[in-house]
């Protein structure tokens, strides 16, 4: 049983609508320090939308968010959704909760090194020399230090995603969010990105991962949520859950019958 002091990231009763369509119907998640939580489910189940609600890239319509015991202050926006009440708090929140996107989202006009030092300098106020030294260490750690001075267009998809992970690590986040980080990659490049993610998990990084990689979910994560039509249909230990699914929809999903 988690106590409040154990929990690093908490999302409670998150609802989200697009027009009249409710896409998230009360999803909750509690991640302790060092947890690797995977979100699985078919396309359109709400996985990525929920992940984006955690740092307000999507504004939920109901729910509460807390990071390290600090609640994100929310107020009602004109469209009825919830927005951050305090812009500086949201900026700090997003640095504490770094995101790695499906399509890398590197800045095309910046070199690899410039991509990685941008947030430490301009968001965290780090001295440039310190940011560069840290960036070089991170690029070496993800195996792309030799690409520091090239532009994203000159990189393979796997290299771009590893740079994106280094960029996320550069702000020293408390939690890392991964939105299907391998789905845009050619199959032969998936392994190099999953290896970096496995290494991060081994270091005790807290990670929330939307993924279709069932092997990663089973072997690396310690908690798994199966989403279907905006609800958590089943959650628990991934090894147990993926080997002996309890609900029929998860059984169908794992057998390929639920698209």
Regions found by a protein language model. Name each.
Residues 6-238:
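ABC family nucleotide-binding domain
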Residues 226-229, 239-259:
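C-terminal boundary and immediately downstream tail of ABC-type ATPase nucleotide-binding domains
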